[in-house]
């Protein structure tokens, strides 16, 4: 019996330690609306961030939580499809990690996580790491140092 109690206690401690008790994300905006889509099914992004933390810092991720989490991944493709390198270079992106659990009412589990993507383009010496939040909403703009791809609305 003691053995089961110890195992149950350890499991409970593990589960509760995985989620931060407070949300540190600073740029959530529940009133934000999903950007319009181009004919190519990418977001139409019209602004580049002047904030050097936007997208690069876990407290200021790109918030793409406009769809149910089960299909929200398509917003990643829509977002990166709207971006270019600073001189119009084509970008490539790869999901490399997930991190930074935070409390969220947008998930049955009561928590969300951030996904980390490495982005590169021709001439870029070191890939850029961009934090993406698929659970919460926010204004969608290009991170500092990126360009906006010329697309047909």
Question: Which residues does each PLM region occupy?
Answer:
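Short, non-transmembrane alpha-helical segments in secretory-pathway proteins
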Residues: 61-98
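C-terminal motif of bacterial Sec signal peptides marking the signal peptidase cleavage site
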Residues: 15-17
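Post-signal peptide N-terminal segment of mature Sec-exported envelope proteins
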Residues: 27-46
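Short, compact, well-ordered microdomains
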Residues: 106-151
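Post-signal-peptide N-terminal segment of Sec-exported extracytoplasmic proteins
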Residues: 41-68
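Positively charged n-region of N-terminal signal peptides that target proteins for export
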Residues: 1-4
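Sec-dependent N-terminal signal peptides
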Residues: 6-10
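Bacterial signal peptide processing site
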Residues: 19-22
């Amino acid at each position: 019996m003691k053995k089961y109690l110890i195992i149950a206690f350890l499991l409970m401690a593990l589960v509760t330690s995985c989620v931060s008790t407070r949300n540190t994300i600073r740029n959530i905006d529940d009133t934000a609306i999903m950007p319009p889509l181009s004919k190519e099914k990418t977001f139409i992004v019209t602004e580049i961030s002047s904030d050097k933390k936007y997208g690069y810092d876990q407290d200021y991720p790109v918030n793409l939580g406009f769809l149910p989490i089960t299909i929200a991944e398509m917003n990643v493709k829509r977002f990166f499809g709207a971006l270019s390198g600073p001189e119009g270079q084509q970008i490539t992106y790869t999901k490399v990690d997930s991190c930074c659990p935070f409390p969220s009412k947008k998930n049955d589990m009561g928590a969300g996580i951030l996904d980390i993507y490495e982005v590169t383009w021709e001439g870029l010496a070191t890939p850029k790491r961009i934090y993406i939040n698929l659970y919460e909403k926010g204004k969608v703009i290009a991170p500092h140092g990126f360009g906006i791809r010329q697309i047909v609305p």
